[in-house]
Amino acid sequence: MRDNFNYPPGAVQLLGLCRLDNLHQAVTKEKQILAMPTWRSWISPPSNGKGEFESVNEIKNSEYYKGWQDFLRDKRLLDFLEEQDKFLIFYQHREMRKFPGLFESHSPRIIIADDSSYDVQELLMESAYLVTDYSSIAMDFAYMGKPLCYYQFDYKKFREKHYAEGYFSYEADGFGPVCYTEEELVKSLFACVGKDFYEEEKYKKRRKEFFTLRDTDNCKRNFQAVRELVKNSREG
């Protein structure tokens, strides 16, 4: 950021995100799995802009809908949840919650969450495993030292129409396996959750190298840094 946007010396500092302080209070529920995909700008543009789809029925023909709905009703998943005595909470991005009733549950083991009953940070803190796609909430989950996987069945379209690829490579830098098919997703989920949340050492190593600050002083550091910048600007 400093090099690309020409910030002056001292303006860019490694301080940690304030919201991460609360994550140290996490109490994980071993029976709870969280699936939390991000939105798609071509389906639900911000500020009510026009997308490719104008109704719930049209969205149900999209690759996005089919990818996630097929996963939620996969018989292997439903049987696995029953056998392992687990529950999966599916929580959509707020931009996708503009379409109530879009996704359906075919099992009491799968809960389609609505924002009025659930808090995002609490879900992250409580859940033992995360299935996401491109969402930055994977950072929060990895920060807590918990396993996850990325489900990116529409990778090419997402990069073309939503966000171009940046400095972070999911394959090289991600905190869990990248799955491009439902088969790969089910296999990764079962391999981890079915073996007492086992994960490969390389993902633990990536977490340790990425999160160099792991304490409850993020708010304090940010407050002190802002105060110092304000002080220096007044004196300058």
Map each language-model feature to its residues:
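Active-site-proximal region of nucleotide-activated glycan assembly enzymes
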Residues: 1-22
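Catalytic binding pocket for nucleotide-activated donors in carbohydrate/polymer assembly enzymes
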Residues: 7-9, 103-107, 134-210
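Conserved catalytic-core segment of nucleotide-activated headgroup transferases in glycan assembly
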Residues: 18-102, 179, 214, 218
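Donor nucleotide-activated moiety binding/catalytic core segment of transferases
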Residues: 94-139
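C-terminal alpha-helical cap of glycosyltransferases
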Residues: 215-236
